[in-house]
């Protein structure tokens, strides 16, 4: 409060706002009912939750001091009229550009809650604040709003823990790939595949148009709602790239980006300055995986040594050369300036064949589909197709085009819903489920993800990045 001549005071409007906000704030378990555990990874744990009804108590305004209530009160005829309807909720209508947090969610809405893990030194948990990855993810999700990006509902800070509440998606590309490879044992219908890739490119084009690199595109991070809308998730490695914050550019912040099977050759060769082309290479890898139901460049990742120096990923480079043939300076003039170019030459020889064409045509007879894949797998990042140009490619006009709201339109396939387990042994804060229903963890980025069932007892799993 500010003092004025005569001894009076002026009520600070922000003080009133903060007092009201603090009175109305509810904890995560008082706001959402945890339905089950979805997955766990390096940075967090993800739960499926449903919104609880608001408590039947006196209004927050009546809980404030009388002077504050008077300052906040308005005559009934002056109250603002509602500007939202149920149909305008972007969680119900993905075409809307309004932010999900612009209106209160309704009871029964389902969400995915990501809880960040605290740092760990030995066996002791430490709370040193939010990680760079977490801060970046929150910032970008709050700023970016698009039909093909996962929507952030709210961020909750409680008991030194941070929770991100996202819209819920029943499927992801990895689940769809697993269903076709293990259950249906049949390829993804060409029309469905084109729509999946088209919506993915729409989201990627939006990110690149706003100078954002995703840097971790892979099937497990590409979600699909039950309405058939593709949603790009996990912006933990994403960052702005038009004005690098460090003198070392993008390399200075994160030296290792993109999961190894989807990593572009310029990253493998140690590029310190790179562009949105790294995301397009990953999209090409995803396209090939949707087509063949298995990763096209499945190399073994070399781990860092005790000196924390980054090793050259020879095996991954070899897998790429097995499909595309060895790269030559005529194909990529800038390769001779790559930090790892001499290492690449010294660790050969690499296969000299180029079986991409027969590999593709054994799975599809579309010449346009092959053309766009070749342009995504261009060695030279400066020549690699952009998301904008890819969306204009004639392949997307085949068989009636992709001008549909749902990627599942015209398909008779019913994909299983996302697996959710009862698990609470790793997180006492979220442990609202009965102990008798406790189980293991669910794989979120493994080809061994089972394809059906809602509540299951899973087998042991490998850690995934969440």
From Swiss-Prot:
TM stretches of this protein: none
Domain Protein kinase positions: 32-396
Transferase in keyword set: yes
Species this protein is from: Cryptococcus neoformans var. neoformans serotype D (strain JEC21 / ATCC MYA-565) (Filobasidiella neoformans)
Family label: Belongs to the protein kinase superfamily. CMGC Ser/Thr protein kinase family. CDC2/CDKX subfamily.
Native organism taxonomy: Eukaryota, Fungi, Dikarya, Basidiomycota, Agaricomycotina
PROSITE patterns reported for this sequence: PROTEIN_KINASE_DOM, PROTEIN_KINASE_ST
UniProt GO BP: negative regulation of filamentous growth; negative regulation of transcription by RNA polymerase II; nuclear-transcribed mRNA catabolic process, non-stop decay; positive regulation of transcription by RNA polymerase II; protein destabilization
Annotated stretches, region: Disordered: 58-105, 421-466
Subunit structure: Component of the SRB8-11 complex, a regulatory module of the Mediator complex.
One GO MF term attached to the UniProt entry: cyclin-dependent protein serine/threonine kinase activity
Record PANTHER family: CELL DIVISION PROTEIN KINASE, CYCLIN-DEPENDENT KINASE 8-RELATED
Active-site feature positions: 216
Cofactor field: Mg(2+)
The enzyme's E.C. designation: 2.7.11.22, 2.7.11.23
GO CC, one annotated term: mediator complex
Catalyzed reaction equations: L-seryl-[protein] + ATP = O-phospho-L-seryl-[protein] + ADP + H(+); L-threonyl-[protein] + ATP = O-phospho-L-threonyl-[protein] + ADP + H(+); [DNA-directed RNA polymerase] + ATP = phospho-[DNA-directed RNA polymerase] + ADP + H(+)
Domain of life: Eukaryota
Protein name per its UniProtKB record: Serine/threonine-protein kinase SSN3
Annotated function: Component of the SRB8-11 complex. The SRB8-11 complex is a regulatory module of the Mediator complex which is itself involved in regulation of basal and activated RNA polymerase II-dependent transcription. The SRB8-11 complex may be involved in the transcriptional repression of a subset of genes regulated by Mediator. It may inhibit the association of the Mediator complex with RNA polymerase II to form the holoenzyme complex. The SRB8-11 complex phosphorylates the C-terminal domain (CTD) of the largest subunit of RNA polymerase II.
Annotated localization: Nucleus
Residues annotated to bind ATP: 38-46, 114
SMART domains registered for this protein in UniProt: S_TKc (SM00220)
UniProt keywords, alphabetically: Activator, ATP-binding, Kinase, Magnesium, Metal-binding, Nucleotide-binding, Nucleus, Repressor, Serine/threonine-protein kinase, Transcription, Transcription regulation, Transferase
